[in-house]
A protein has these predicted regions:
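Positively charged n-region of N-terminal signal peptides that target proteins for export
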Residues: 1-4, 86
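Sec-dependent N-terminal signal peptides
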Residues: 3-12
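Mature catalytic domains of secreted/periplasmic carbohydrate-active enzymes
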Residues: 16-427
Length: 427
């Protein structure tokens, strides 16, 4: 614990001079307006079809795991179709795994041959193909990058995971960090404009010196507008530009990941899976419904956060039809109701059991997700000029009473989300 506290203090001291550039501040504004992104967990682990943690969970050694790339040949990978699918769903950015915890690079890295170009029969740079397509279709691309590495021998001393990989009990930690920074330099100089870096894995060695100021400084020097975030489950470090929450809304801790996290002032994001797995799992049929996912997106917006929704492509490069169909349905809803999500911030009424509110200048959107009564009582909202149902324009009666505002909700409400638009002066 003492070492961990020292790490926090040292990192803060080293990064305390970080001043976001105007480009970075503009990127943060764009990010908060975008609201909805596609998360992609794809790597050599998809060959086994048992999720991205299979190497650790099944205690597979490096020697055995290195046999997998020979079977990874995603000839049906179509980056244009992936990007079109994301845009059809109403998503504004894509975050893809450049390297997950197994250390396998999904681009042609020059730092080792443990990558898709050198080790697989595919021999193509998947990240370059996707980056080029994102630029063509006008959607931002972020890279998820694991700081944790179960393959590299210099990731030493070992952390909490990957202890059965069969690596020698020796290594050079600073050499590993140099390796990681050199890979990041490749990603930030060879793939055009990048939206940001989504770090993960620092929780594996919370007492280590991760040289965060140096790594974050490298990113900002190469691409000042690139946003840095880390899934470390702690309050944000100086040098970070957005804060994420894994499988939880900001301020919640239903999954146990966010117990030491505090909601800060940075842009927020929550990520979630469409079934139970991040990486492709052929046995996982626990698909979330379209209603569940739309309501999670709406709740995220009401909590002033983005929603990053994950797919785990198959080893052949295709995305499961169940995912494609659900994303299309979400996109159809966003096409009709996106006004109440895009470009909004959390509304004046804090999240309630019945739903959430969002807002933008001149308008408050009341998202009624679960409420059967005719009357909905809100805290006092002054200067409300009118209320209508989004889409139909049906008028909604508004009553100002002592200490509150009452809405008389219409019959035949939407089972997913009845959105009431309040036109309000002074907002």
């Amino acid at each position: 614990m003492k070492q961990f506290l020292l790490m926090l203090l040292a990192s803060a001291a080293m990064a305390q001079n970080y001043q976001p550039t105007p480009e970075n501040l503009n990127a943060r504004q764009w990010f908060q307006d975008a609201k909805f992104g596609l998360f992609i967990h794809w790597g050599v682990y998809s060959v086994l079809g048992r999720g991205e943690w299979v190497m650790n969970n099944e205690k597979i050694t490096v020697a055995d795991y290195e046999k997998l790339p020979a079977q990874f040949n995603p000839t049906e990978f179509n980056p244009a179709a992936w990007v079109a699918m994301a845009k059809d769903a109403g998503m504004k950015y894509i975050t893809i795994t450049s390297k997950h915890h197994d250390g396998f690079a999904m681009w042609g890295t020059k730092q080792s041959d443990w990558d898709i170009v050198d080790r697989t029969p595919y021999h193509q740079d998947a990240l370059k193909m996707l980056a080029d397509e994102c630029h063509r279709q006008g959607i931002k691309l972020f890279f998820y990058h694991s700081q944790l590495d179960w393959h590299n021998p210099d990731y030493f001393p070992r952390g909490r995971t990957g202890v059965n990989s069969g690596r020698p009990e020796q290594g050079d930690w600073n050499k590993y960090l140099d390796y990681m920074d050199n890979q990041l330099r490749e990603l930030l100089t060879g793939y055009g404009e990048i939206g940001g870096i989504w770090f993960d894995g620092m929780w594996d060695k919370p007492d280590a010196d991760w040289r965060l100021a140096r790594t974050y400084g490298l990113i900002h020097s190469l691409q000042p507008a690139a946003m840095v975030g880390s899934n470390h489950h702690l309050k944000p470090f100086d040098g970070e530009d957005f804060q994420m929450f894994e499988k939880d809304l900001p301020g919640k801790n239903t999954t146990g990941f966010s117990g030491r996290s505090e909601v800060g002032a940075l842009p927020l994001e929550t990520c979630e899976t469409m079934n139970d797995a991040w990486g492709y799992n052929s046995n996982d049929k626990h698909f979330k419904s379209t209603t569940q996912l739309i309501q999670y997106l709406v709740k995220a917006a009401g909590n002033n956060a983005n929603f990053l929704l994950n797919v785990g492509p198959m080893p052949n490069g295709k995305i499961q039809p169940e995912f494609v169909q659900t994303l299309h349905a979400v996109g159809d809803w966003m096409g009709r109701n996106g006004e109440s999500v895009y470009g909004t911030r959390g509304g004046p009424v804090t999240p309630r059991p019945w739903g959430v509110t969002t807002q933008k200048p001149g308008k408050i959107y009341v998202h009624v997700l679960d409420w059967s009564d005719e009357l909905l009582a809100l805290p006092k909202l002054a200067n409300v000029r009118s209320a209508t149902v989004l889409g139909s324009g049906q008028k909604v009666e508004v009553q100002q009473v002592d200490g509150g505002t009452l809405l008389r909700l219409p019959a035949g409400r939407d089972a997913v989300d009845t959105v009431i638009v309040l036109a309000a002066d002074g907002r």
